[in-house]
Amino acid sequence: MAMDPKYFRNTLGRFATGVTVVTVNDGEISRGMTANAFSSVSLDPPLILVCVDEKATCLEMIRNAKKFNVNFLAEEQKEISDWFAGKGRDAEDQFSELEYDMGENATPVLKGNIGLLECELYNEVPGGDHVIFIGLVTRALFEEDVKAPLLYYASSYRKMDLDAQFN
């Protein structure tokens, strides 16, 4: 029996995720895409995965560059997430209006992020209408001051109350 794609998507939406922007530079141009299909894979070696739509511009760039960054967005970076997920997706220069630096791997690092992983392409696996890129983490940074992450749940951005903790 075939799964209804909309029902499947809505079910997956009941799993809260952080929001990331995956950035890549192929030596000539930089691109980015919003992604919440991100996960850690292994501590030794340090591996992560990101899932990229087969139609995404970043797909071939990651394959060719063999490197990418994963920027963990802070709560106040909703507009950046929207930019890379929406109208900015097709912009000629996605980074012209944004504050960023180039990482040690010559790939964009968004200013204000709460965490960063610089990765070398370790492997790729087909995954239906997506490609699963596995990255070997070569550099990891995080914001020392705990700041609220940008969350996504039930098709909407959400906030985290950092003062609310389980006993």
What are these regions (language model features)?
Residues 1-167:
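Basic, polyanion-binding surface patches
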